[in-house]
Amino acid sequence: MLLFYCWNHINMTDKLFAEVAGAPEDPILGVGQQYKADPRAEKVNLSVGVYQTEEGKIPVLRAVREAETRLYNAAAPHGYGQISGNPALGAFVQELLFGKDSEVVRSRRACTVQSLGGTGAIKLAADLLHFVVGKTKAATSVPTWGNHNAIFKQAGFDVSHYQYYNKADGTIAFEQLLADLRAKEAGTVVILHACCHNPTGLDFTADQWKEVLQIVIDRGLVPLLDIAYQGFDRGLEEDAFSIRLFAESGISFLVSSSFSKSFSLYGERVGGLTVVCQNADEAARVLSQVKQ
């Protein structure tokens, strides 16, 4: 009887979550749920960026299957890993981004931490830039991947935008984009799509990238290059052009990498945040903060 009384009393007085409002459904994943609920056979799921066969199955790449086999045969123990993730992954990420013989790699002036996909890398970048470096303003392209805006706002940034797409003719609104970037306050974090711009698919030419880089330098902006589709445009090396251009300039910047698409490892959440600094000592100190 006492237990029954206590239970009823708690039910009547515990209002901890009573006023919590329901959040809107994710616009992309929500479409996927609608697709599954649709009984019609003549339907195509264009919501989430996942490569599937005609039967709706995700194929396993031969390289991924071979890697899985090697790991299984090695019977590696399931102990705790490093806070920064698998160091071998970090080394390969840097090689993929900058090239094996890059000055950035040789000088060790960049640090890489493993992340929960590209989303996790962007979250780590936003937290580092806001809570450690003290940045408060960020700018994303119009349009952009929705999580760019959401993550930076959640981290405490005042998020503005720069025009990217010209709806009238389906091209990059490059002159407007340059004007918008020039108008940004010094220290603004600018999120740039390194290749395969999401969602337009339109990328800068090499000369346009050089113009953007010059404005970043002149205005004292902080670039975060997001690369989620390396190899999907012109090739692994070619798609890293913008990142290597920024590295050669000598400025400090950040790169968020995702391998969800590259290896069809959507659910494994494989990604990394790379921070390019001025020297190895600086990179070590930055890494110590990201690991917090």
Question: What residues fall within each predicted segment?
Answer:
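Hydrophobic/aromatic beta-strand patches that form the interior of the parallel beta-sheet core
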Residues: 44-46, 139, 160, 224, ...
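Histidine/acidic-residue-rich catalytic or RNA/ligand-binding cores of hydrolases
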Residues: 235-237, 268-269
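Conserved core of the PLP fold type I
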Residues: 70, 75-220, 224, 230-232, ...
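N-terminal "arm"/small-domain region of PLP-dependent enzymes with the aminotransferase-like
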Residues: 13-85, 92-95, 99
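Short catalytic/ligand-binding loop motif for oxyanion handling, primarily in non-cytosolic enzymes
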Residues: 52-56, 199-200, 264-265
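Short, Lys/Arg-enriched N-terminal segments with co-localized hydrophobic residues
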Residues: 1-11
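Conserved core segment of the aminotransferase class I/II
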Residues: 248-292
